[in-house]
Curated annotation (Swiss-Prot):
GO terms for molecular function: structural constituent of ribosome. This is Small ribosomal subunit protein uS15c. GO terms for biological process: translation. Belongs to the universal ribosomal protein uS15 family. Keywords: Chloroplast, Plastid, Ribonucleoprotein, Ribosomal protein. InterPro entries: Ribosomal_uS15 (IPR000589), Ribosomal_uS15_bac-type (IPR005290), uS15_NS1_RNA-bd_sf (IPR009068). It is found in: Plastid, Chloroplast. Pfam families: Ribosomal_S15 (PF00312). It comes from Nicotiana tabacum. Its main location: plastid.
């Protein structure tokens, strides 16, 4: 599973505020909410929360891609996330 490999890398750094760690946490929350919404389609409050978390993760990924493209590519590949479209 992807989670174990990423956790080992992040726990070595012990940087809870790093962009990678925040994106990792948001990705876990997104996956949990997505599975919840498959069962509860009319849970609109959770849908709103999911959209907010998606926006936060998108902003963090945009920041990381501007600052360090190599770390961005590694994180995208580790978490199995699609690359965001840039304007």
């Amino acid at each position: 599973m992807v989670k174990n490999s990423v956790i080992s890398v992040i726990s070595q750094e012990e940087k809870r505020g790093s962009v990678e760690f925040q994106v990792f946490n948001f990705t876990n929350k997104i996956r949990r909410l997505t599975s919840h919404l498959e069962l509860h389609k009319k849970d609109y409050l959770s849908q709103r929360g999911l959209k907010k978390i998606l926006g936060k993760r998108q902003r963090l990924l945009a920041y990381l891609s501007k600052k360090n493209r190599v770390r961005y590519k590694e994180l995208i590949n580790q978490l199995d996330i699609r690359e965001t479209k840039t304007r």
